[in-house]
Every structure is written in C-alpha cells, then in structure tokens.
Amino acid sequence: GYPEEATYFLKRSQGWKQLFDPEKKLIFPKDRQGNWKHRNPLSGDGWVEANAWQATWSVSHGIPDLIELMGGKDVLCDKLNYAFEQAADDDFVYGYSGGYISYANQPGVSNAHVFSWAGKPWLTQYWVRRVRAQAYGAVTPDRGYGGHDEDQGQMGGISALMAIGLFSLTGNVDQNPSYEITSPIFDRIEITLDDRYYEKGKFVIQTYHNSAGNCY
C-alpha cells in the first residue's frame, strides 16, 4: 500500500469542513488567507458553476459529518427540502450558479438522493419523481432539455437513473458499494448484466401499484 499518500488524501478529503459556516449551515468559499469571500448562498463567486445552496450537499463521502455539523438529520433534511421547494416553480432548471437547486448542470444532480442518507428516503422518492417529471419529463424546452448542460452524457444518465429508481450517491467507489432504491416510473425494468462478472443474466426491478401519486 501507500500509507503516506493515503494519509495525505484522507486529510484533503476533510478540507470542506473548514468551509462550513455554522451560522448559515452551508458551505462557502474562502480566500487564501482563510477569510470568507462572501456569505451570499445564491452567489456563484468562488464556485465553479454552483453556489452554496447547490453545492453544500456534494460532499457525498462525508454526509454523516455534514449531518453532525448541521445539527442533526432533521435540520439537514428541512434545509434541503426548503431548497427543493424554492426551485420547484422553475422546474429545477437554472443557468450556471443560479437557483437553490439546479438539475440543468452537473454540480447538484445528486442532491435529491441525500435525503436517503439522512434517514428520510421518502423525501428522496418524492423529489426524484418531481425532478424527473419537470426537468427531464419530455423533449420540449419546458419539460426536457431546455438549456441543460449535457457534458459526457451526465444529464441523460441522471435522467435514466431516476427513471429506473437506482442511484449511488458515492459513485460506487466504496469498499462495499451499494445502490439506493428510489422510485422507478416503469412497472418492470430488466437490466442485462455482463456475464463476465455476474452469474445471472438479468437484474429485474418490478413495481406494484405504480403511479405518479404512489411513488413511495
């Protein structure tokens, strides 16, 4: 192994905690001297195509730590739920660095799945359904790819994962990787598996009493 490198990168992976503002309970950028650049959660200054509302939840390797810093699961879920409520009327689609939640660009497309890691999977299921329908639900500019930043197929990828009800917040890089189950829109889904790695040929997702109103 490489113990020195492991120690170095483990420390680096915790650096986001120094950017957490305990008063606003969000992450903000700092300058080289360690001072806040600003504390406007909707400003993109200091961010790459994001803002504090969109990017705070992106520490997918450290959600338990984020929960602790925020003051508990309920606090995190209430704050994130508020962000989704603010973005719903605009179909969760904004330009770069704009809005509370944006599914038109890469930085925030995992946000709906954070609820599951904070003990409220029903909120993940609810908002996954809403986002998929409103941001990816058709091929029109209003209900489809209206200004979406399609880099390397990521927006199409998150749309497909929402539709089949599977997602991995950590990108399947854990020692024991797993998928979260959300809310598939189809009654039956068959995924053909690579026989070089799996004994069985298909992975089947079967839903019962599936409807727009019965998403849990």
What are these regions (language model features)?
Residues 1-204:
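Active-site core of glycosidic bond-cleaving carbohydrate-active enzymes
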Residues 198, 209-216:
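C-terminal beta-sandwich/jelly-roll accessory domains of carbohydrate-active enzymes
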